[in-house]
């Protein structure tokens, strides 16, 4: 795995960034191999950098909890890396606030266990809540600010414990632009009228839904 990462140029990317920016910024770690490689690059650049450990929700992204615990347990072996906390993003278009609430409680519980077991106090929590956006006037999204208000109220319970960063994604930018294209053809099949546009399905489809 390590050789594959280096052959893809991940090490070169880190080296270039560290040479250009020094220890500025925060790096998100997706794997134990990436953590080790980042440490080597930081050592060569003679800098100490801040990192967040991305915890997986069970998909291909991030580290599982056991890997995070192992990294934290052995953190003194990597003095070039300063672990600030954890990062998590599990998906988008969440219609139920209970899902968001349970995820934040889960992350808080993970941080508590890291402190109890290894004396590591997470300073930062970065989380993508996946708040929903209405693309086609779906009534389920009519009260678009209600969940945001619930989230703000929930985070009041944690703001003294962590520096919290929210990844708001499409909730902020979904209405920031429009897609303009031309009509190439209009036809009717079995009584259903279709408009053929000069664009690809990747332009009019959106994550988590079918057109």
Where are these regions (language model features)?
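Conserved, mostly hydrophobic/aromatic
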Residues: 19, 53, 86, 127, ...
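Conserved anion-binding
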Residues: 30-82, 88
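Charged (often Lys/Glu-rich) extended helix/loop segments that serve as interaction or gating elements
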Residues: 163-211
